[in-house]
Amino acid sequence: MSKPRKKSKKILFILEIVVLLLFIGGLFVYGQISAKLDKIDIQETDLADQDIVTNDQAPQMTGYTTYALFGLDHRSKNEKLNTENSDTIIIASINNDTKAVKLVSVYRDTLLNVKDDTYSKANSAYAFGGPTNAVSMLNTNLDLNITDYVAIDFNALVTVVDCLGGLDIPLSYAEIVHMNNYCVETSEETGKSYTPIELPDPKPEDEEAIVDTYHLNGVQATSYCRIRYTASLDMGRTERQRR
């Protein structure tokens, strides 16, 4: 009877060691990510204290948290914030129970009432009045009641992706070509490095077909989100941004 007990104690001891190592590893990873995230310049703004326009007549949804996500055409640290267009506009809805996330893009060239009955491209609302005006535009035109937002520029997006260890993204031949081209500019503007992806040889007959899945770093992922010259044009661009 003693042998089974010794074996059980040994297995329990091994499990305790494994759990301890996983815990230590988790703390290490958390520390590494936290240290990198601390390098991101985060500016918090309470929109509730500003003149954000809400739509009181819009249907009130319960059990969901909704955010407006803005990708800013802000490239240099010397440029003043809130004066640039938001070339990426995404509405993110999170199910509070299941944590499932649904993303809907608003095309940047959509003609909307951006401020005081002034109609222009949706991406210009941010330049007209910062996040307050951009969120108000969404509420006014789309019957929403959003009060929270996240805005991110090139530098922050590159840093966040690198903190996550990169992203695995399926790419077509055409996407590789355009992404490599964009990487040159993105790298220069952010000061971050990258390695160009080698083009498949031979060149596929269908340049729009997926050729493989590639691991992208921050510069590459940001450049991937900027692609708009494939056959699907801006529809394809917004789809890439939601991945």
Where are these regions (language model features)?
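Entry/capping segment at the start of metal-dependent catalytic domains
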Residues: 8-98
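Flexible, solvent-exposed short loops/turns enriched in glycine
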Residues: 102-129
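Extracytoplasmic
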Residues: 62-65, 84-89, 98-106, 117, ...
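Flexible, polar/acidic helix-loop-strand segments at domain edges
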Residues: 63, 162-243
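Structured segments of extracytoplasmic/periplasmic soluble domains
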Residues: 70, 76, 109, 137-147, ...
